[in-house]
């Protein structure tokens, strides 16, 4: 079994106000697969992603990342293997420059300055915005912010990449690159 597998087994989630977001969801995503989840607004897509990241805990069922069941004890190690790009890039970008935002995670992981620079440069090139490295996020378009948020996660080199509305705000060329 691949250590990159994601598995949900009979997962349900109800918000504290009683609104049921997910009911008895089961699926497996294997290493190398790309999966898109489609649904109407309010259908539970973002809730599902928050459950996968351990931000929310299922009311019933279980989530496994690789062969490890997600529990409060395993969550810190699981989170190191997952990268989440939020639906709204403004929730993710908070530093004074795009470079600083993309470098934030690798620096907090205590990587060397040389490794941080290498990862930031590579991530910015991957999403096509190396020319924006010195620009403050508030001076970027929605698509540029989206690309910067994706670069910030790519710089962490997660085993699993989870994207909430990954192509919103991106132009057609940037969508193909993403």
Stretch-by-stretch model annotation:
Residues 157:
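Conserved catalytic motifs of ABC-family nucleotide-binding domains
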Residues 161-164:
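Catalytic Walker B motif of ABC-type/P-loop ATPase nucleotide-binding domains
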């Amino acid at each position: 079994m691949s250590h990159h597998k994601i598995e949900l087994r009979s997962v349900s989630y109800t918000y504290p106000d009683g609104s049921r977001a997910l009911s008895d969801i089961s699926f497996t995503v294997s290493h190398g697969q790309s999966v898109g989840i489609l649904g109407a607004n309010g259908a539970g897509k973002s809730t599902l992603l928050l459950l996968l990241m351990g931000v929310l805990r299922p009311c019933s069922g279980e989530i496994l990342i690789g062969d490890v069941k997600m529990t409060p004890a395993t969550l810190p190690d699981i989170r190191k293997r997952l990268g989440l790009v939020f639906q709204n890039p403004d929730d993710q970008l908070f530093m004074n420059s795009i470079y600083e935002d993309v470098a934030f995670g690798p620096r907090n992981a205590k990587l060397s300055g040389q490794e941080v620079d290498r990862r930031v440069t590579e991530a910015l090139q991957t999403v096509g915005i190396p020319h924006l490295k010195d620009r403050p996020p508030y001076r970027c378009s929605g698509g540029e912010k989206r690309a910067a948020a994706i670069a910030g996660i790519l710089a962490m080199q997660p085993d699993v990449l989870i994207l909430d509305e990954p192509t919103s705000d991106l132009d057609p060329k940037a969508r193909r690159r993403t």
